[in-house]
Structure formats: C-alpha cells, structure tokens
C-alpha cells in the first residue's frame, strides 16, 4: 500500500498492510524558522520516512500588550491570514510541500485555543503560571477573556482552511484544557469545547481531516467524547 492509502484505510477501520506511523518533534530554535525550517523538515522526513508528515508550527500568536487582569484581554485584537505569523507559517507549508514526499499523508500543526490564547503572554509568565492565570481570569470575569478567545479562534479557523487549500490533508489539532488539575469538567465544556469544535469543524468544512492531540498529563479523556466525528476515526 502507498502511504496515503494506508493512512486513509486505517482512518476508515479498513485492513492495512502495516500500522501507519509518524514521528514529530519541536526542532531546535535555530532551525525552526524560514529556510532552515524547510531544510530541517525535509531532512527529518527523509531520515524517518513516516506515513504521516507533520509540518511543525513555531509561528505563534504574538504579544499584543500586557495582560494582568481579565479586562486586559481586550488588547487581543482579531487575527487573520494577513498577520505576519500566519504568513510565515503559510510560506513554510508551501515550501515544504513543494519538495516533500506527496505520497505521504501531510498535515499541518494547529495549536488549539488554549495554547494560542496563552502564547502571546507565555514569555512574560512561564508555561504553568500563564495557564493558571488564564483559568483564574476566566473565573474572575469570563466575558473579556472569552471575547479574546473568540477572536483568536476565528483566525485559527482561517488558518485551518488555508492549510487544506495549500494541499495538506488536514491538521493536527493540539488540544489543551483536558487536564483535571486546571479546568473543571463544567469549565472545559463552557470555555474550551466550543472553540475546539469551531476550529476542527472549519478544517472539515474545507475538506480536510483532523488528528486530535490531547496534550499533557492527568487528562480526563471523557471530556472529549463529544468530539467523535470531528477527528479521523469518524
């Protein structure tokens, strides 16, 4: 079987000649952007020869201002494909696809709503403190925070669709928020789930497929039961 044929068969629970596989990593920062990133991806794909080739995304939602209170989230403006960080990732995808094995199942990395919401201020606080800050601000005054998250989600929907338009088979959606020690089940359902589903639906509507990556430790996988139909075993 060819690589893409093998992956699609596995997604449909059909017989395969072997289990399709892939490996992925965050490349060192010095080769994470621009031409260096293109070459590093191609080298990695050639050495690993995976069925699924995932293009990494280190082009993150940028800082838009200091955020110390829930009201400060109003500084997060709408994002679109015209933003430089999106243009940079689009260019990376184009250049990798121009030279990579198109017999493979090719996907882009789309950081989910939680990751993309904290990325603008993560350098200011550190990874765990900024995640705790997001939870705290949502509990204190959810309206301005959810408004900011909606603006981010709308932009991510555009990127998901663009990935498919460029020729990718879909996205790896990197979901956060399922960990028991941060959001409660009810908070996840209200604050996170609607945006996750909005973005994953955008990929499906564009003709792509989703691989759902549920990140981190102590994840309550039951929170994702209603996502069935949005990811690749549908």
Identify the residue ranges that each predicted region occupies.
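Short N-terminal amphipathic alpha-helices
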Residues: 46-64
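A short glycine/small-residue-enriched secondary-structure motif
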Residues: 58-76
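Active-site loop segments of alpha/beta catalytic cores
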Residues: 1-35, 40, 51-55, 81-234
């Amino acid at each position: 079987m060819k690589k893409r044929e093998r992956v699609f068969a596995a997604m449909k629970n059909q017989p395969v000649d072997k289990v399709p596989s892939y490996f992925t990593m965050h490349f060192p920062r010095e080769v994470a952007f621009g031409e260096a990133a293109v070459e590093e991806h191609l080298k990695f794909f050639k050495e690993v020869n995976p069925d699924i080739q995932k293009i990494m995304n280190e082009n993150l939602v940028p800082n838009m201002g200091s955020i110390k209170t829930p009201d400060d989230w109003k500084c997060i403006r709408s994002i679109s494909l015209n933003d430089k960080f999106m243009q940079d990732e689009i260019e990376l995808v184009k250049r990798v696809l121009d030279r990579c094995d198109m017999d493979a199942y090719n996907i882009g990395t789309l950081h989910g709503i939680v990751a993309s919401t904290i990325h603008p201020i993560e350098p200011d606080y550190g990874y765990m403190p900024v995640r705790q800050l997001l939870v705290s601000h949502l509990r204190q005054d959810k309206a301005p925070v959810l408004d900011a998250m909606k603006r981010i989600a709308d932009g991510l929907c555009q990127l998901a669709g663009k990935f498919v338009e460029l020729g990718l088979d879909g996205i790896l959606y990197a979901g956060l928020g399922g960990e028991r020690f941060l959001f409660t089940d009810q908070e996840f359902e209200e604050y996170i789930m609607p945006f996750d589903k909005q973005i994953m639906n955008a990929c499906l509507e564009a003709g792509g497929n989703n691989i759902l990556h549920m990140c981190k430790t102590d994840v309550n996988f039951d929170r994702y039961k209603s996502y069935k139909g949005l990811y690749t075993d549908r």
